[in-house]
């Protein structure tokens, strides 16, 4: 099957992303993973599948990769739905990413799917580190839950710790500049998201995100403000 080859290529990319040296996985860290893997892995993967792509098309695809890298967290943003994000993180998470890769029909959708793959890889490796960080920063939670405090144990503490990791990385100037991110842009492949979500869970996206256009626009704006 043609799609199988690209899923295998994406699996190799997953291994690269899994070893990237970032501990916290807020918005900035997820985008930084795209930057780390862009020249060596993501761009070549796009060019292999779409050999005729122009430089401008590759640049636009970069913006879609940024969008895909935080799509699993869409439900946390205003007008979102936590159930959407909980599904993508805890129920058939890998299947969702696989469907994204299979359902991608053009270079922008494929870049968006690779961004979602990077998020999946980052969460597998990074969340245990964040859980340990929560226990260190919140002794009262450590006393209650032990040396690993998950998002389910205390969502607020988990999100604050993730963001704190981002702040530390910014302070140490480990991220590519805001000007570069603004130059590249930030795009969301709504059609691919809808197809992959329904293929994975058997329900339409708008059953969870009733204001999906507003949700996605708010998500795009909020992420651009964090950068």
Predicted segments, located by residue:
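Bacterial N-terminal signal peptides
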Residues: 9-18
């Amino acid at each position: 099957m043609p799609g199988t080859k690209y899923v295998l290529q994406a699996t190799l990319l997953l291994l690269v992303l899994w070893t990237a040296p970032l501990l916290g996985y807020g918005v900035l860290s997820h985008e930084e993973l795209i930057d780390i893997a862009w020249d060596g892995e993501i761009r070549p993967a796009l060019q292999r599948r779409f050999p005729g792509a122009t430089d401008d098309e590759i640049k636009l695809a970069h913006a879609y990769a940024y969008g895909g890298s935080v799509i699993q967290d869409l439900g946390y943003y205003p007008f979102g739905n936590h159930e959407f994000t909980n599904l993508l993180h805890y129920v058939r998470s890998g299947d969702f990413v696989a469907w994204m890769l299979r359902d991608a029909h053009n270079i922008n959708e494929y870049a968006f799917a690779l961004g979602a793959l990077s998020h999946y890889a980052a969460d597998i490796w990074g969340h245990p580190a964040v859980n340990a960080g929560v226990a260190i920063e919140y002794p009262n939670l450590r006393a209650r839950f032990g040396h690993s405090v998950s998002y389910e144990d205390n969502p607020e503490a988990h999100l604050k710790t993730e963001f704190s990791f981002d702040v530390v990385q910014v302070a140490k100037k480990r991220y590519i500049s805001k000007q570069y991110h603004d130059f590249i842009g930030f795009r969301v492949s709504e059609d691919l998201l809808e197809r992959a979500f329904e293929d994975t869970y058997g329900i339409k996206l708008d059953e969870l995100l009733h204001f999906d256009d507003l949700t996605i626009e708010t998500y795009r704006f909020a992420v651009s403000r964090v950068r």
